[in-house]
Amino acid sequence: MDYEDNLEAPVWDELNHEGDKTQSLVSNSIESIGQISTNEERKDNELLETTASFADKIDLDSAPEWKDPGLSVAGNPQLEEHDNSKADDLINSLAPEQDPIADLKNSTTQFIATRESGGALFTGNANSPLVFDDTIYDANTSPNTSKSISGRRSGKPRILFDSARAQRNSKRNHSLKAKRTTASDDTIKTPFTDPLKKAEKENEFVEEPLDDRNERRENNEGKFTASVEKNILEQVDRPLYNLPQTGANISSPAEVEENSEKFGKTKIGSKVPPTEKAVAFKVEVKDPVKVGELTSIHVEYTVISESSLLELKYAQVSRRYRDFRWLYRQLQNNHWGKVIPPPPEKQSVGSFKENFIENRRFQMESMLKKICQDPVLQKDKDFLLFLTSDDFSSESKKRAFLTGSGAINDSNDLSEVRISEIQLLGAEDAAEVLKNGGIDAESHKGFMSISFSSLPKYNEADEFFIEKKQKIDELEDNLKKLSKSLEMVDTSRNTLAASTEEFSSMVETLASLNVSEPNSELLNNFADVHKSIKSSLERSSLQETLTMGVMLDDYIRSLASVKAIFNQRSKLGYFLVVIENDMNKKHSQLGKLGQNIHSEKFREMRKEFQTLERRYNLTKKQWQAVGDKIKDEFQGFSTDKIREFRNGMEISLEAAIESQKECIELWETFYQTNL
């Protein structure tokens, strides 16, 4: 036995090497004694360690066997026989001779499998609780000595539950595992930091003594105020959650700011590249002047513009209202599917009143400014011609004729459009089409064709355009109602101002009677307050007209421009249906002339069919391009108009608040000085 494996085992456990039977008896006796003295052995650890160290120094296997001469039975046969019989009886009672696991001990082909070190059966011990002598694993053991496995059990089992050793081994294994775990954690794991807990710790309130706080506040009062303001601004701009940034998603604050500026300046859905920006442009419309005699009287406005796009960097010209309408139609013809800033509506009655002229001047200036802010429209040839031409009357007619826009003397509604055949088919083919009366000339030939054949009709297939057009009609109707309500409010406010003025004059008349000097002074001051209120009402009425009224009017006219681009798509769709109808007719005629392929009539008919096919392809291409352009423009238009409407509401609200504050101050001053 190796005493280093089990230091607490009895010293005499392995001294008897005479036979297996005696050894089994002694081991069983030791087991019973060990169970009785377990508690004493736990308490006396120092004695056991001393015994273990003593056992290590002495070789028990080579020690001579001690014999008592008085008790020796070697020379007495009776005592020796009696002693042997007693020992046999005791061994047979405690350990039968038949060993059920003898075959396992003596067989060279069978072995006992023990549990691996991962799941110990008893108290975490990895070794088998049944330990046999060395003959089990002796390769020279004879197979004849093996017995049947099914026989009765015999042998010399050792102590099954060695609690002291198990505890010592378990503690040692646990400490080794703990050391390995900590070592692996130190080498593999990295320290984890919770961003939310870190933010809470940064914002955590730390109590400080009042004296120190007062001293800091007195010494650094300016710095403290600045830091508080900075912290408030940072908290306002700070996101709700601080998400950790990873790898490619990390961007510097400068890049974020640059991207936000690009997003804000670039219209949503616009096909203009984000890097392209509008060139700086200054436009001003001022100095309206009445020109002409009774039959040709009109108002001319001075248009001043400054930009690097102009040939001379500066231009000053005079333009009338119809010139602004010409510009609108030309831009509409040059840029299909794009929302063009509209001019004011044509109005014949009251066109020479002062308020009307000022309102129209403001609207035309707003139109030019919006065109200048668009990077595409500001570079248009017709727009630059409008700003710089000194002989605009003749040059505008030439441009309208060359482009086929029909912009001269236009008096139609802003939502009505005209599709230029020159812009659609090209100059050569358009000349032939116009010579024959237009694209839809075939559908209007003669009275009989109108009576007995149905005209081709275009039906919109895309739900987007149907839905958006319906919403635009509803929005336009509601805005017109709101504009009328605003006019009623303005009229009522002007009526209130007139009534206030009349009341003030009556109070002044009453004060002129001079019943008493204090009374007259009080009444005169009272009348002055009402005059000031009357002036405030007139100013607020004018302010609301110039903000909400102009904004609503511009919104309604812009919706007319949006309806115009929808009508452009419908017009192109109508031309597409007409050309397709003509193609079908020509195709049927070619089918009838199929037998006369070499005839002159067949060749002429086939040439006409090829021309119609080319027109059909061009029209379909333009129809699809306009549809895509409208979808992009509509989203950007909605965003811009929402922003403009909100700004107009804010300005109107601020003006109303200032007007009410002025009235309150007037009444407070009157009360403090006179009452």
Swiss-Prot record:
This is Vacuolar protein sorting-associated protein 5. It comes from the Eukaryota. Plays a role in vesicular protein sorting. Required for retention of late Golgi membrane proteins and vacuolar biogenesis. Component of the membrane-associated retromer complex which is essential in endosome-to-Golgi retrograde transport. The VPS5-VPS17 subcomplex may assemble onto the membrane to promote vesicle formation. InterPro entries: AH/BAR_dom_sf, BAR_Vps5, PX_dom, PX_dom_sf, PX_Vps5, Vps5_C. Residues 195-204 have a biased composition (Basic and acidic residues). It is found in: Cytoplasm; Golgi apparatus membrane; Endosome membrane. Present with 6120 molecules/cell in log phase SD medium. GO terms for biological process: endocytic recycling; protein retention in Golgi apparatus; protein transport; retrograde transport, endosome to Golgi. Residues 1-26, 65-84, 165-219 are annotated as: Disordered. Keywords: Cytoplasm, Endosome, Golgi apparatus, Membrane, Phosphoprotein, Protein transport, Transport. Gene3D superfamilies: Arfaptin homology (AH) domain/BAR domain, Phox-like domain. Phosphorylated on serine residue(s). The gene is VPS5. SMART domains: PX (SM00312). A 1,2-diacyl-sn-glycero-3-phospho-(1D-myo-inositol-3-phosphate) binds at R320, K346, R360.
